[in-house]
Every structure is written in structure tokens, then in C-alpha cells.
Amino acid sequence: MMKKSFYLYVLTFRGGDWSDPKVRFAEEMFHEHNFPKQSTDFNELSNYIESYATENLTIEAFDHLWELYEGQA
């Protein structure tokens, strides 16, 4: 079975406690129309985040979410 995209994984954090950087990242990512939604590639995703970082779409939150994403069974 193919692993779901990082985008679909992060969407599971939407609607949570706004004090959580993962939640803020998920909400911001959802509204980014050019986000690489099908990607499972770290370099493609991190390059996008580095290029389009915002107050909520941070590389720190991305790194934490990527660790969680990679840790999935």
C-alpha cells in the first residue's frame, strides 16, 4: 500500500488547539493552493516550506511534523 501524502497526514491536525504549532501549520498549509499535495519527498516539501515560510508555516513545525509522519507504521 502506498503511503499517504504528507499533506493528507498533516490535515489530520486541523481544528485542534491553536496554541499548537502543528495545528497552525496544518491550517496555513490547507490554504496554500500551491502546496505539493501529493508529495512524500522530504526535499521537495522542505524546499517549498523554506521558499514560502510564514508565521505559521515554519520549518520548525515542518521538521516536527515530518518526524511524526515518518514514524507512522
UniProtKB/Swiss-Prot annotation:
Q: Which InterPro entries match?
A: UPF0346, YozE_SAM-like, YozE_SAM-like_sf
Q: What is stated as this protein's family in its record?
A: Belongs to the UPF0346 family.
Q: Mind telling me which NCBIfam families this protein's record contains? A: PRK13672.1
Q: What is this protein called?
A: UPF0346 protein Bsph_2735
Q: Which species is this record about?
A: Lysinibacillus sphaericus (strain C3-41)
